[in-house]
From Swiss-Prot:
It comes from the Eukaryota. GO terms for molecular function: DNA binding. It comes from Oryza sativa subsp. japonica (Rice). InterPro entries: ARR-like, CheY-like_superfamily, Homeodomain-like_sf, Myb_dom_plants, Sig_transdc_resp-reg_receiver. GO terms for biological process: cytokinin-activated signaling pathway; phosphorelay signal transduction system. It holds the Pfam family Response_reg. The lineage of its organism: Eukaryota, Viridiplantae, Streptophyta, Embryophyta, Tracheophyta. This is Two-component response regulator ORR28.
Length: 380
């Protein structure tokens, strides 16, 4: 049997579902007296579900028994929550075990209370209810009879759900990877000038948020480009062989020939970038053997003649600068420069002085010593 089936507008309503009619009636009277709720009592859970299916929006609180023969209380709770998701259900049971409490909470119940209910329990029921939902439901019921229904509905929908103390809460947009992918896709289609909301096809996003994110995107691109250019420049400096000028200096001391009467000591330093042609080798060898200067202008057709070549001295030493302490020895300086490889320079010098004794000191500079004698009368 159902009591007070007609729920009047403007009041909070409750339902009591219990197969024990005496307990259901006593609970109904205490709720009406203590909480001033309009209560509907059902002894059949099936009829209670039929009532909820037709008038689920008008019920704010449901008290249901767990141990019912016609339908288990857990099944009733599950179906009631499916019919009305915001409905608040309080379960009643003679056994308040941990399992029963956990099961009720998992299915969406507010709390499990022990039967039979007393006045103190009824008075404390409101502490377990969502008062905000109850107030909103009451306001909606009160506004149904005032003004146009469509106007009231629009005003209620415009109210923020999380409104507190009359201040509107500010929401922040989080750019998830999915939103970032849509943003980049729209950027490819339209470019950086404009991004259309229709292309992104995302709700709850405005142009201001898109423009702000576009500015951040441009700043990130600038940082990445500057970092990439700096890294590329540093790699080129370290990997470019021509970035550094490597100088290998060799000093050649020509020792006196054993068959000459008047020995003359000649020191030669050779500067050259890269010489590989056989004609150049032969000319250098002849110049060293004859004690004359090496003229590089005769070999301008050499493929490596574009490199800087510097010959110091003319084969006949200047007396103001080249005469040593003995007064009869001459010095001619020719410096040979090879990039990067000291061993390669050593190979060239070995080809030039194959028939003579060579003494080499390795390090930052290599020194080759050889003495050649020639008479002053031959040079005149």
């Amino acid at each position: 049997m159902a009591q007070n089936e007609g729920i009047p507008n403007g009041t909070l309503s409750a339902m009591v579902i219990d197969e024990d009619k005496c307990h259901a009636d006593s609970t109904c009277s205490m709720i009406c007296t203590q909480l001033n709720f309009c209560v509907t009592v059902f002894t059949s859970p099936i009829k209670a579900l039929d009532f909820l299916q037709n008038q689920a929006e008008g019920v704010h609180l449901v008290l249901a028994d767990v141990q019912m023969e016609e339908m288990n209380g857990f099944e009733f709770l599950k179906v009631a929550r499916e019919l009305h998701k915001s409905i608040q259900v309080i379960m009643m049971s003679t056994e308040t075990t941990i399992y029963t409490m956990k099961r009720c909470v998992q299915l969406g119940a507010q709390i499990l209370v022990k039967k039979p209910l007393d006045v103190v329990t009824i008075q404390n029921l409101w502490q377990h209810l969502d008062i905000k939902v109850l107030k909103m439901e009451k306001i909606k019921d009160m506004l149904q009879g005032v003004g146009d229904k469509s106007t009231c509905a629009n005003e209620m929908n415009s109210f923020p759900e999380n409104q507190k103390d009359g201040t509107k809460r500010k929401y922040y947009l989080m750019w998830t990877p999915h939103l970032q992918k849509k943003f980049l896709h729209a950027l490819e289609i339209l470019g950086e000038g404009q991004i259309s909301l229709m292309i992104m096809d995302v709700d709850n996003i405005d142009r201001k948020q898109i423009s702000t994110h576009l500015q951040k995107h441009r700043l990130q691109l600038k940082k990445k480009l500057s970092k990439a250019s700096f890294t590329k420049g540093s790699n080129e400096d370290t990997s470019n062989p021509s970035a550094k000028n490597h100088l290998t200096c060799r000093t050649m001391t020509l020792q006196p020939h054993p068959y000459t009467n008047q020995p003359a000591e000649t020191t030669m330093q050779i500067h050259s970038e890269d010489v590989e042609h056989d004609d150049v080798y032969d000319a250098m060898r002849r110049a060293l053997q004859d004690g004359t200067a090496f003229d590089e202008s005769k070999y301008s057709s050499d493929p490596f003649s574009n490199e800087d070549e510097d010959v110091v001295g003319d084969g006949y030493a200047d007396k103001a600068n080249a005469i040593d302490s003995s007064g009869d020895h001459y010095q001619v300086a020719v410096v040979l420069t090879t990039p990067h490889n000291v061993d390669y320079t050593q190979e060239i010098m070995n080809k030039v002085t194959t028939s003579d004794d060579v003494q080499v000191t390795r390090g930052g500079k290599a020194t080759v010593s050889r003495l050649v004698d020639y008479s002053d009368s031959d040079s005149d």
